[in-house]
Amino acid sequence: MDKFVVRLPKDDMMKQESKHERNYKQATLESLRRVVVIEDIERYKSILELPGQPKENMIEALKELDKKVPSREVLKSTRIGHTVNNLRKHSDDPEIKSLAKEVYKHWRTFIEEHANKPSIEVRCDKQTESLRSNAKKLLSEAIEMKVDHELVENIEREVFHQSSRLVSGAYRRTVRALVFALKHKPELRVQVKDGKLPVNVFVKSYKKKS
């Protein structure tokens, strides 16, 4: 018996294919609740602990933290639980205090119910950490503060965040631009130190592209 290849019209073929299609929702690794990027946790902690931080920045940080559920180990190593709990107990702002309470309660409940389910932790490699440490040193010298000061850490973490968490050319150029500005613009340096110029706004104004 002869064999024939039957070619359907393009529209008919598309209709048949569509019957077998399935709808998939793409999810990034970071969008999953049990995936915890340590750098993000450290950044939010830095934001919450920096004196004079604008309220909107603190609210945003708490809302982002509420989307994640760090493991007991991450809570201990980063001490983010201590930071949130401190805001829950001692914040003078009712909204911040209430939101911190929600985050703390959410984490505690989730950990108690999922104690045996580990979270996935994403950390920076040693080379990246080394380069970032050098950037912190340059920033600390420019702003005339110790390298472990909360403000220095907050600035560097914001640069890293706005550079898509990559020590790229954009990251290096942004650090250089910030260092130059802090060294040669005394009034700007004072504004950043006093908190009159929020760190995220300061970094964004000097952000360099790749």
Swiss-Prot record:
The keyword Transmembrane helix does not apply. Transmembrane segments: none annotated. It is found in: Nucleus. Residues 131-210 form the TFIIS central domain. PROSITE patterns: TFIIS_CENTRAL, TFIIS_N. Residues 39-114 form the TFIIS N-terminal domain. Keywords: Nucleus. Its main location: nucleus. GO terms for cellular component: nucleus. GO terms for biological process: DNA-templated transcription; regulation of transcription by RNA polymerase II. InterPro entries: TFIIS/CRSP70_N_sub (IPR003617), TFIIS/LEDGF_dom_sf (IPR035441), TFIIS_cen_dom (IPR003618), TFIIS_cen_dom_sf (IPR036575), TFIIS_N (IPR017923). Belongs to the TCEANC2 family. This is Transcription elongation factor A N-terminal and central domain-containing protein 2.
